[in-house]
Amino acid sequence: MSKADSNSRQGSYKANSINTQDSRMRRHEVTIELRKSKKEDQMFKRRNINDEDLTSPLKELNGQSPVQLSVDEIVAAMNSEDQERQFLGMQSARKMLSRERNPPIDLMIGHGIVPICIRFLQNTNNSMLQFEAAWALTNIASGTSDQTRCVIEHNAVPHFVALLQSKSMNLAEQAVWALGNIAGDGAAARDIVIHHNVIDGILPLINNETPLSFLRNIVWLMSNLCRNKNPSPPFDQVKRLLPVLSQLLLSQDIQVLADACWALSYVTDDDNTKIQAVVDSDAVPRLVKLLQMDEPSIIVPALRSVGNIVTGTDQQTDVVIASGGLPRLGLLLQHNKSNIVKEAAWTVSNITAGNQKQIQAVIQAGIFQQLRTVLEKGDFKAQKEAAWAVTNTTTSGTPEQIVDLIEKYKILKPFIDLLDTKDPRTIKVVQTGLSNLFALAEKLGGTENLCLMVEEMGGLDKLETLQQHENEEVYKKAYAIIDTYFSNGDDEAEQELAPQEVNGALEFNATQPKAPEGGYTF
């Protein structure tokens, strides 16, 4: 969304409101904030700890009680010519690295374990030894970037990719796990994995017979292959995953669904070409359907994907609308998790930055009632996004649509109340929305009515207070609104305040208009 002009729905803003560059910056900043929150929702690295009761895909193979060896004894055994001692040393190393707390990864690396493990990976005559070595390296690669780099620099990646074709499913699965940890370390490590043809290796592994635990690991690896920017992954490779990821959205497994959605959220967090590739994979109706799930671990990445898609072209946004996205977004605006409400409001704000037909679809879906509730009592981060949705509508909507915001959906009061926030960016968004409303009222001959409404709702007092704001843009915008619409000049004000003769008696404020029955409207 920060890559090119076409990446922002906000680019459709009119020149008299928020400028295009500012809105692109806003989309970029919001996406950065959302991307940071992913760390709470998805693990990029996973350690295979030594616990029989866990639902991890790989279990102890021999059921033997562990033999306690020192690190020096482990290394000596691994370097032995005796195959049984090699296996005992390798297994002991793996178990030490599989401790739930404080595994001695650096200690093992310092004792030269990694190159020995790499050598064992290539021992095709002993799949048990290969498996133990792969497991140990998986856990080393689950550590810090330096620890992962050690595994990469000893040329483990091509050996793991080769093991994807192993006849031992346990060994192939452990190789997938190791590659997932390596790819999850960052863009550079990810690209090393991709350039060793990992996609050629994993696609044949997915079929109707693939065990669920194995499938989960494969999809998690796929999500890490799609993740990270600066640079983004090579799209000529990643796009090969899209038909499979789209098909995986039909899975019944929560973990498979979640990781498939995360993968698509990473792909769509880019330019319109990549968004279109996801649209072409028929993923959108499936993503939209997943928005009605009860499981937040699925809703969050599915919503992120849909939110990214509506930052694309009008046609791409139309696919979301045609797939029934708006009613589901309306429900998510009422969700009990504030981060889901925030992202639903962010998604709606991008749709209202589109064309008038799309804004009408938002109106007809009843979403502005939900936005009003968010503005009134939602979490502040969600309120910010709701404010953008309103301001975008005042920018791009028809006069009838904008009037509906005020008269039908009663948005004005909670919208104005956000002028009290401490966040200058949000204040400016509300000020821009108000400026747009006044510009329309002027065209419709309703400026006086709108002024009275804003004043009755406390808006004038808030704007006057903002004239003392430390942010220059904020106080200049506040001054401009007051000066243009609320200031009639001193002479006129004095004339209004002077007593006038009415029916032979002096009255003050004799010329002040009386409020019409039913209140003020445009």
UniProtKB/Swiss-Prot annotation:
GO terms for cellular component: cytoplasm; nucleus. The modification Phosphoserine is found at residues 12, 17, 56, 65. Residues 1-56 form the IBB domain. SUPFAM superfamilies: ARM repeat. Residues 1-28 are annotated as: Disordered. GO terms for biological process: female germline ring canal formation; gravitaxis; lymph gland development; NLS-bearing protein import into nucleus; sperm individualization. Pfam families: Arm, Arm_3, IBB. One of its GO terms (molecular function) is nuclear localization sequence binding. It is found in: Cytoplasm; Nucleus. It comes from the Eukaryota. ARM repeats lie at residues 64-105, 106-148, 149-190, 191-233, 234-275, 276-317, 318-359, 360-400, 401-447, 448-489. Residues 1-22 have a biased composition (Polar residues). Predominantly expressed in the neuroblast stem cells. Its main location: cytoplasm. Keywords: Cytoplasm, Nucleus, Phosphoprotein, Protein transport, Repeat, Transport. Belongs to the importin alpha family. Forms a complex with importin beta subunit. Binds specifically and directly to substrates containing either a simple or bipartite NLS motif. Promotes docking of import substrates to the nuclear envelope. Seems to act as a cytosolic receptor for both simple and bipartite NLS motifs. This is Importin subunit alpha. It comes from Drosophila melanogaster.
